[in-house]
C-alpha cells in the first residue's frame, strides 16, 4: 500500500473533524489528475472538516460522479428510494465538463458545473482514488473549501 493510500485510508476512517491544514498538506503530496484518468464511474465521500456542506450531499442520496468524456459529466449521481442511480440535474443546476485548470500553482483535472460557479479540482491518490477540493462562490464557507474524495467503481 502506497503512503498516499495509507494516509487517505486514515482520513476516511476518522470520525472527528479533520483540520483543513491537514488536508491541504496531504493535497500538496499528490500528483495532479488527468482528464483521461478521471473517465469512469466514481463513488464519492467527504472529509469531515466542519464545512457547511458536510452532510448535505448524503442527505440528497449522493452516490458519486460519472465522467463519460471531458464534455459529458454527471456531477451529482444520486440513489433514489428504490436504489436506482440518477443524475440529479435539478440539484446540480445541470451537469458538468472536465477541464485542465491551474489551482494552487498546478494544472490539474477540474470539473466545472454547467449551471453554477463551482469547480471541483482533483489530485490523484492512486489509479482508483482521487481527492477533490470544491471551490467557487456558492461553496466557500468563510473562505474555506469543501474537501471530498472519489473512488473508482
Predicted regions and their residues:
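Edge beta-strand at a domain terminus
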Residues: 136-153
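Short beta-strand segments that buttress and anchor functional surface loops
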Residues: 44, 109-115, 132-137
Amino acid at each position: 500500500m502506497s503512503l498516499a493510500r495509507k494516509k487517505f485510508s486514515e482520513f476516511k476512517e476518522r470520525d472527528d473533524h479533520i483540520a483543513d491544514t491537514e488536508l491541504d498538506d496531504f493535497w500538496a503530496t499528490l500528483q495532479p489528475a488527468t482528464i483521461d484518468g478521471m473517465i469512469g464511474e466514481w463513488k464519492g465521500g467527504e472529509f469531515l472538516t466542519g464545512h457547511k456542506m458536510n452532510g448535505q450531499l448524503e442527505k440528497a442520496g449522493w452516490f458519486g460522479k460519472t465522467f463519460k468524456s471531458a464534455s459529458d459529466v454527471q456531477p451529482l449521481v444520486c440513489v433514489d428510494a428504490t436504489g436506482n442511480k440518477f443524475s440529479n440535474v435539478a440539484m446540480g443546476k445541470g451537469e458538468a465538463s472536465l477541464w485542465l485548470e491551474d489551482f494552487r500553482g498546478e494544472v490539474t483535472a477540474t470539473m466545472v458545473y454547467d449551471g453554477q460557479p463551482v469547480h471541483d479540482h482533483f489530485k490523484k491518490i492512486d489509479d482508483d482514488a482521487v481527492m477533490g477540493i470544491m471551490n467557487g462562490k456558492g461553496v466557500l464557507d468563510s473562505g474555506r473549501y469543501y474537501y471530498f474524495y472519489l473512488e473508482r467503481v
